[in-house]
Design a protein with these regions (language model features):
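Class I S-adenosyl-L-methionine-dependent methyltransferase catalytic core
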Residues: 1-239
């Protein structure tokens, strides 16, 4: 996660989802995988949600809090009045590879009392780089009674159904998790060069170890998302 992305439509989507999951009875922990500095890309520019009623209806408290951000930064997000009570954060910048193991242990300690831990790496799950979370870090964070959620950005290397199956199978092997589901979302946003045209932004949110109540909350959230224009959502992996 970089400061330049704070408050983008992807934040509205993921924070609304996390708030829906946490409700009033789960403690939320956020592992930002924070990368200081601007990478020069145009990602994070989509703020059209501020003027779209449907996003406000989805979660009015979140909409108000994000729209009032005094600056676009991860620190400002943490201070915003958008989080469930007692939410926890780990914002220590991503270290060089040699320091990653110790960094991961500090992250686990910072989020120890969280019932739901969300991993927010820039490019999803992958190798041990500053843009990825790793399978070993998921293993380190797992414990009884906790669900882990992470964001994935599906590529075009294969059909998405096959890619999802591959992801779930790899997670089962690498983390020993038996219960894995994914919320697949697709949000169409204005194209930079053609404002009246739209491009698709696909974000997947994968759960490890969700209980029945969290699955029910995820299902309800997916249904609510379909009421927003140019947004699609489907929940996969439910037995």
């Amino acid at each position: 996660m970089r400061d330049q992305y704070a408050g983008d439509v992807s934040d509205v989507l993921k924070f609304a989802f996390l708030r829906a999951l946490a409700g009033k009875d789960r403690t939320l922990g956020i592992a930002w995988y924070y990368a200081p500095g601007d990478d020069g890309r145009s990602d994070g520019r989509h703020l059209e949600w501020r003027d779209e009623t449907a996003w406000r209806v989805l979660d009015e408290e979140l909409h108000t809090g994000l729209a009032a951000l005094p600056e676009r930064s991860v620190a400002a997000l943490e201070r915003a009045m958008i989080w469930p009570e007692a939410a926890l954060f780990h914002r220590e910048p991503m270290p060089p590879r040699a320091g990653r193991s110790a960094w991961g242990i500090r992250k686990r300690s910072a989020l120890d009392s969280a019932d739901i831990v969300f991993l927010d790496p820039e490019n999803g799950i992958g190798e041990e780089t500053e843009k990825h979370a790793t399978f070993s870090e998921i293993r380190l964070l797992r414990k009884p009674g906790r669900a882990i959620v992470f964001i994935t950005f599906p590529g075009r290397s294969m059909k998405h159904d096959a890619l999802l199956q591959q992801l779930h199978e790899r997670l089962a092997v690498e983390t020993d998790a038996e219960n894995i589901i994914t919320l697949r979302t697709n949000v169409s946003v204005p194209a930079a060069e053609r404002p009246r045209s739209y491009v698709q932004r696909q974000r997947w949110f994968t759960f490890i170890d969700p209980d029945a109540e969290l699955i029910a909350r995820a299902r309800a959230f997916a249904s609510n998302l379909t009421c927003i224009p140019r947004v699609r959502a489907v929940l996969d992996g439910i037995a």
